[in-house]
Amino acid sequence: MSTEYSADSSKSFMIAMQSMIDTSQTFNLDRSKISLPDFDDELKKVQKDEQNQRTELTVLSQDRNDWDDIFEEFKDISFAQLQSIIDSYKTKNAVAVYKKIGKLINEAETTLSSNVLLETVLQMVYKHQKQELEKELLDFLGTGNIDLVSLLLQHRRMIVATPIETTILLIKNAVNSTPEFLTQQDIRNQVLKSAEDAKNRKLNPATKIIKYPHVFRKYEAGSTTAMAFAGQKFTLPVGTTRMSYNTHEEIIIPAADQASNKNYLYTKLLKISDLDHFCKTVFPYETLNQIQSLVYPVAYKTNENMLICAPTGAGKTDIALLTIINTIKQFSVVNGENEIDIQYDDFKVIYVAPLKALAAEIVDKFSKKLAPFNIQVRELTGDMQLTKAEILATQVIVTTPEKWDVVTRKANGDNDLVSKVKLLIIDEVHLLHEDRGSVIETLVARTLRQVESSQSMIRIIGLSATLPNFMDVADFLGVNRQIGMFYFDQSFRPKPLEQQLLGCRGKAGSRQSKENIDKVAYDKLSEMIQRGYQVMVFVHSRKETVKSARNFIKLAESNHEVDLFAPDPIEKDKYSRSLVKNRDKDMKEIFQFGFGIHHAGMARSDRNLTEKMFKDGAIKVLCCTATLAWGVNLPADCVIIKGTQVYDSKKGGFIDLGISDVIQIFGRGGRPGFGSANGTGILCTSNDRLDHYVSLITQQHPIESRFGSKLVDNLNAEISLGSVTNVDEAIEWLGYTYMFVRMRKNPFTYGIDWEEIANDPQLYERRRKMIVVAARRLHALQMIVFDEVSMHFIAKDLGRVSSDFYLLNESVEIFNQMCDPRATEADVLSMISMSSEFDGIKFREEESKELKRLSDESVECQIGSQLDTPQGKANVLLQAYISQTRIFDSALSSDSNYVAQNSVRICRALFLIGVNRRWGKFSNVMLNICKSIEKRLWAFDHPLCQFDLPENIIRRIRDTKPSMEHLLELEADELGELVHNKKAGSRLYKILSRFPKINIEAEIFPITTNVMRIHIALGPDFVWDSRIHGDAQFFWVFVEESDKSQILHFEKFILNRRQLNNQHEMDFMIPLSDPLPPQVVVKVVSDTWIGCESTHAISFQHLIRPFNETLQTKLLKLRPLPTSALQNPLIESIYPFKYFNPMQTMTFYTLYNTNENAFVGSPTGSGKTIVAELAIWHAFKTFPGKKIVYIAPMKALVRERVDDWRKKITPVTGDKVVELTGDSLPDPKDVHDATIVITTPEKFDGISRNWQTRKFVQDVSLIIMDEIHLLASDRGPILEMIVSRMNYISSQTKQPVRLLGMSTAVSNAYDMAGWLGVKDHGLYNFPSSVRPVPLKMYIDGFPDNLAFCPLMKTMNKPVFMAIKQHSPDKPALIFVASRRQTRLTALDLIHLCGMEDNPRRFLNIDDEEELQYYLSQVTDDTLKLSLQFGIGLHHAGLVQKDRSISHQLFQKNKIQILIATSTLAWGVNLPAHLVIIKGTQFFDAKIEGYRDMDLTDILQMMGRAGRPAYDTTGTAIVYTKESKKMFYKHFLNVGFPVESSLHKVLDDHLGAEITSGSITNKQEALDFLSWTFLFRRAHHNPTYYGIEDDTSTAGVSEHLSSLIDSTLENLRESQCVLLHGDDIVATPFLSISSYYYISHLTIRQLLKQIHDHATFQEVLRWLSLAVEYNELPVRGGEIIMNEEMSQQSRYSVESTFTDEFELPMWDPHVKTFLLLQAHLSRVDLPIADYIQDTVSVLDQSLRILQAYIDVASELGYFHTVLTMIKMMQCIKQGYWYEDDPVSVLPGLQLRRIKDYTFSEQGFIEMTPQQKKKKLLTLEEIGRFGYKKLLNVFDQLTFGMTESEDTKKRFVSVCQRLPVLEGMKFEEQENNEVLTFYSKHLSSKHNNGFEVYCDKFPKIQKELWFLIGHKGDELLMIKRCQPKQMNKEVIIHCDLFIPEEIRGEELQFSLINDALGLRYDMVHKLIS
């Protein structure tokens, strides 16, 4: 019999009560109307009055009672709980027990409130068994509350008989009751009394219910369709029936009535045709549905965050698509109607799907929909990894919550990816209440904080099924309730769904229960099939699909209903043929009965076939798993969930099917466009879980947070990420979580009483306590450092690793206890199996035999636990997984996969923990275990087993066990014989060639007695196969002690295909112990390949530790010397101070009163410039008229000195100061007149090489070398040669040359002094403490495993915090490694400023107009933005004006922060209170990787800390990798020993001396070497220079002699010297190399390629290949730009660099080639860095071309010389050879000379007159007068309006063109000399002889080539320069005439090297 709410229903009483609550509007309580279930009158009244259930809640007036207040204690009680109350009160003595418990709780000695204590204690009672409970209660309550503990233990069974919420209420009520036994009437009276008491209380005024515009529901309140949005519980929907049968109980919830939903019926559907082009393209149907139409205005036309709660199947995915299209639209430019230009690289969309299967479906759907826009959609899950390139190329990434958490929580995070996210879509957001909900909370909180900190827009969209408390979720997602919160009830479902919930009798899991479920499921299945429906039956294991199908067929046969399920004969026949070849017997068999199966274990083809058959109606019943519901869009008329017990391997047992799965499965019932009018969803469960699913489906429970249980791990993740650095930030972070929202709404659930929330509404103190407790836990586990004084957090390696690999803190605790550096494989496997991740792996009796079998068959390592423990079971399963043993039990197989999946992650974490702790053996074991799990192969197995080889071959290899070394030596035939299979030989040979192998070469360089530098070169030796090796291979490089116990150094090495043929170099420092170990071992191990390991032992047998004799000059307590000690009032007037500082006082006598050489080592900022000036004053006094040379290592330093001394010295003494650098080429007369020459090492080296012909070099009396410690750098050899050469010059000229070396403190000062010829009283080596402003130094370490960019990103927040701590209102200087980093650092600091109360805290400009004035002057956009926040930028990529503005504002303290590259430390004297060195590495193009900065650079940067006269102390903070901390700590304090690097580049320097005649034989070369620093250090540190065998004086000399031999051989190979025994003769090519300061290797490569008739393209290639361009930087990301430039260039890289010249796109010579072409084509360069790079390329190009012209002339290649001269003209003017030379003039556009039919070579060699035709030439224009030139300008510009300034400039340039009157020759001196001269026609030519080269970055002087030739034979060439004679400008030169050509008639050409001017004439020589 079926009636609505029958009296025998267990729910009837509460339903009755609920109805009365809903209908009581005035609450005038009548005792007769409140009754218990045995009062039939009231029940009948309820049954008749259905309208009462639909009555809306009215707003109560102030004088009426509020039911919520009256029944405060009962408001959250469900039906079952109230029934439990009644049952409990019927129990004898229950009240007395509860009363006593309540009394003892109130009297308990504890700091907790009674409410919290009661709940906490009861949770223990419910959670633990009696044995555990006693210990837990005593630990918690203590012995002082022993009575309470005893009472709880005694009555535990009674207490847990009722739900915990009921027990809490019973105890509270019992405290005030007296009777020990209550009748039913007593209970009723007590309820009424509570109501009466509540009635008399003063009530708060009722609040008005707010109506929200987008909440669409049938009822406002009173039913579940109206939703319990405030977290209340309501009854079932109207029309619900409940029926009871013998086998089951059934509740049917009718489908929603769409007819009464006005919003659904009358919503105007938006037509797709009315929408824009984007929507028309994506949506192929005519209209949007109701929900989509209502959501469209907000989803598509705003950027509001949104929450869309709607039934499954209502079209939420397309709503998500609308928001995606909106995002795409924002990054698109529409050109015309259908042309759309999308900025693909500027945005990312993240779609977070709950399951991988759903992610795959979304990817498939979105890919098709967005294909017209070329939008890439890819899956990023545990199964589908993406490479960095794929991530960059993808716009829409579909991922899972856990995967996106992993991506965003890593500090090495794909920061570019995260920063580009503009839309985050979270599907199934109702998962918040499940275990995975905490992950969603973490993601949203992290995203919201990122939005706030970065001030960037990330839109968040939440998609959900209907939620009970959706407003809370909306608040959590940051949704505006009035705009973005959408709720649609079940009536909006396109196909209404009838839900049938069946509770089958019998104990859950019992046989009876299973049989009842099978029977009931069949009955429902049969019923639906009879209606003509197709049905999906969902089961919960793959095996169960077939089992259920067979069971249904069996029941159908027994009921004679087989024909009911029979498939349609036509469809059956159609698919029978397809199934004939199918191997799945089960599938074929059950198909005959109209059944199908579908699960993830089937082949994809079989799954696709099943789906197609179901769609076509060939099968009526499909038995499937839940993956079908999530992953495939395959609807059915009816879905049946058969059973709700799902095996969870994480918990090691069966759990309830999640509500999200139920909703998703039900969502497949009755999809639009398929089958019946309504859908049907049937759930078959056990009777005890029926109420649970009823409450879930009808949303009777609000969604609560699960975040609290994961707080410790999530806090660690945020600390490791760097987003939370202190307690306050952590409290703020918690405020973004859903837990915070619910804690305030429902505090009792979270252990918070109402009193606490009343006193602290924002729960600040509660959150603080939670954070502090969690932080203490992390601190105790050594995962973070928690300073409880400052409340700051510091991440540690263990915490970072735990965060990156998702380790639980409980597991970390276990590992801390069990990790052992000597652990074996068995120990490690036992430890892994004890992880808390495997606590849920429970032992079940039925699997004992299977486990025993697995233990016997597959366990290779001893198991430390019993098989019946979680640890023992996990261990066996893991070893079985590695051994690839088959597991038959499905639950055990699931457990095995779970264990293996998690073990990989845990092992990787443990490996990194071992590496970070420097445990060699442990790390090796862990890496082997990692690879074993990943490859499913034991580490001791043969490496070839990793390849896909036949079983018999594998078996043979395992039997013979040949080593890989042996196999690699065999040929294919021999390999075939080895495995007894000749055919397999070639395959094995191919496989072996692809097995990764790395060759290692190592060199050692002792630095000090305790530190050694190791240089290793790694050479890959295998064939790359993308199918095997993918895009990259990962290796670990370890340096271990000989016993492998201790790791001395480690690095991760990434090898990609393009680098396969390169040698990879690494440099690192290791400590040396005492006594010295016999050897260290360099080991390179593959990260993935088993057995792939290379080792190289470095023996210390012949190692000699260096002898670094030094001294530290102690600062004597002298009275400061007054400036009057100079005894020269003129000089004294220069100085603004009265006294020298202590360091200057100590050095004064030696420098000012003697002519002794001196070395002064002192920290930066200690006043060394004054020391140099003291030496200068002495030189002025002692050697008047002599020159002083000041050598600074950088042009910026030179400029600083020039500016300073020109202001300081020249006006006072009259002595001129001249700059001599590559940028400044002064007139020779200026150099001659100057007293002080300030230059760079390279420039002075080039000049002094020809000292015999340069008098000013011979006149030098003092050389000051600043920063001489740079000897150790690449430029150090130049300084060595200068010193050696000047000493040599001094010995030759007998004129003394004083040397002054200035440096920071060095640790081998005696060697430095000895080399400089310094005596004891001239040696000063002061410690860092002599600084006028004392320096505080901090060195902070960061994770070693981070790549460069993520590492820099990680440092930004610590930089910001350091500025706030150390320099909150004083200047701070931040040094970074690259120009790009200045920009990225500035942007991050701006984001962090945005989170401050005062975002402009670093800006000290109050006047907005003043700020705008500065901003208007700035060109760079980033600088313009950053200046508004008080942050300046300074690097070479900025234009000079931008740099000057930054410099000026920082100097004036208008801005507080300046971010600069390291060059600023050298070039600009700009001190600050705080200096932060952000990273100690920079990118080096030579090694295509990052290398450490020189210590000298770091010291120089640190030297900028502390402002004299402003600061009492300065602060310097160095951020580096953790492994480098000790290195910098040692050497930054002690000083670094300086070594020579001359031996690496001796070739060119020795060549220069050979050219000058200083060296004519090998003995002289050796003698010259004895003057060098190299000679001295080779004796004191022989091992560093490769001297191992014989380290005696004779042995060192022999080594240096062999060094000279090899150097001379190199020069000979370059055709630069001729060797005759010991004599050395320089060739002209060596003279050319030395004169133009280019490498002999450049000459060598040119001589290999040069020929006559070279093309323009060939010359351009030769120029690009010059060795001088080796160091042109190629930065990350420039390869793509180079490829694009190559495609757009005249000469592509592919067509130019062919055969032996083939070069990759990342080669600096290729970049040079492309930049030169871009310069000639005058095209815009893609990035600012390329502009500066082009300047560098052009700077070198002319010097190299001059050398090339001389080489070609020497070889007599006439045509090649002409081409090279043309190349020089083109480079200077920035045009191509066929462009009109006239068109380079001001105001004209480049134009080609048309209508020529000559070849390229012919065109280059044509004279201007030949080219002329109808065009004017430069020579003609140069002869015109002023008016004519104005007419010519109008003619050339076609009358287009140009500014007057441009016209004037055109005229001015034309009037100064170096047009000549002609060529004249005279012969003299016995006809041996031919004199040529000509003169300028223009009298307006400037005296500087500058020529117009507008596109060249430096000023160019007039220069002519005079070429004499006969036909194609080049006979003579001479460079001619103009000079002023009287009022005329004359070009004059003398040519030597060889005897053999006298009397010949020669053709002479005079060609300008910059302009298209050429003069030709024929002259016959006199015989």
UniProtKB/Swiss-Prot annotation:
One of its GO terms (molecular function) is helicase activity. GO terms for biological process: cytoplasmic translation; defense response to virus; regulation of translation; rescue of stalled ribosome; ribosome disassembly; ribosome-associated ubiquitin-dependent protein catabolic process. PROSITE patterns: HELICASE_ATP_BIND_1, HELICASE_CTER. It catalyses: ATP + H2O = ADP + phosphate + H(+). ATP binds at residues 310-317, 1162-1169. Involved in activation of the ribosome quality control (RQC) pathway, a pathway that degrades nascent peptide chains during problematic translation. Drives the splitting of stalled ribosomes that are polyubiquitinated in a HEL2-dependent manner, as part of the ribosome quality control trigger (RQT) complex. Also represses the translation of non-poly(A) mRNAs together with SKI2. May block translation by inhibiting translation initiation factor 5B (FUN12) action on mRNAs lacking a 3' poly(A) structure. This is RQC trigger complex helicase SLH1. The gene is SLH1.
